[in-house]
């Protein structure tokens, strides 16, 4: 019976992995027409840079996308980037970082660590540098922040974590009390294990809740109560409430800030406006 359960779990993981890969959207055509867009290579990975054609602000955002560490950029990510650029004038750098199960966090940080260093070295000292991500990308963003803090590299002026996945072990008992209409705990745990590899579950690079907090500053977390990642995000924020501003929305689902069609709801609209306000102020 136990063997059958794990076979079924592996089958379900294969289905969601396939669906997330085949659902990956191509770049929207209007990105090329309406924005300054470039696609570069860094250590054989694509790096997308998108910015406004006019009214550019001295703001650079490094954005790490979510997708449970197995999913690529989706159409809603690009729509979110376009909205952010239109409303802030910022330039957004989006790396196509390696994904599980072919890769673990070790391969991800082999690319993200030198890429981060390159970006901050090329920035003007007066440039507002913002690190941002959603879901798994938000967890990766925090881990990248912690890693660069240990390396004494320039840290972001602000870090914005949207519906962050901060602990792939998913062992917080409060998780089971969350009425999440989107995320499935068994699949998340399996994705997290694939990303962590053999020994990664003990590393803060996989689970930033285990990481150093002494250099944290200007960290903003937006999370909804109907998101099973909320309990760990809230716990982390409470433990570091002098360094982390936790913005919680009652009844909001996972990644509500990114869903443009849901901005008709009060919390989705307010969450998006809050992100814009953090970027600009």
Positions of PLM-derived features:
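Domain-scale detector for complete catalytic domains at protein termini or as standalone homologs
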Residues: 1-134, 138-281
């Amino acid at each position: 019976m136990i063997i059958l359960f794990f076979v079924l779990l592996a089958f379900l993981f294969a289905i969601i992995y396939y669906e997330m890969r085949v659902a990956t959207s191509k770049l929207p055509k209007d990105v090329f027409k309406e924005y300054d867009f470039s696609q570069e290579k860094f250590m054989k990975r694509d790096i997308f840079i998108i910015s406004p054609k006019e009214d550019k602000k001295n703001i650079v955002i490094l954005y790490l996308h979510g997708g449970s560490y197995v999913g690529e950029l989706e159409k809603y990510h690009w729509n979110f980037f376009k909205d952010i650029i239109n409303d802030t004038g910022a330039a957004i750098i989006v790396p196509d970082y390696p994904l599980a199960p072919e890769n673990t966090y070790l391969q991800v940080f082999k690319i993200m660590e030198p890429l981060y260093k390159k970006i901050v070295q090329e920035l003007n000292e007066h440039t507002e540098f913002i690190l941002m991500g959603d879901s798994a990308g938000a967890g990766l963003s925090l881990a990248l922040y912690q890693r660069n803090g240990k390396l004494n590299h320039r840290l972001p002026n602000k870090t914005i974590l949207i519906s962050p996945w901060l602990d792939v072990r998913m062992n917080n008992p409060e998780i089971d009390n969350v009425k999440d209409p989107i995320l499935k705990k068994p699949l998340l745990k399996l994705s997290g294990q694939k990303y962590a590899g053999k020994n990664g579950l003990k590393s803060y690079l996989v689970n930033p809740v285990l990481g150093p907090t002494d250099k944290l500053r200007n960290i903003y977390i937006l999370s909804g109560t109907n998101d099973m990642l909320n309990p760990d995000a809230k716990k982390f924020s409470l433990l570091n409430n002098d360094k982390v501003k936790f913005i919680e929305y009652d009844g909001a689902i996972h990644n509500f800030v990114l869903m443009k069609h849901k901005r008709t709801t009060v919390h989705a609209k307010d969450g998006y406006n809050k992100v814009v306000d953090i970027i600009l102020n």
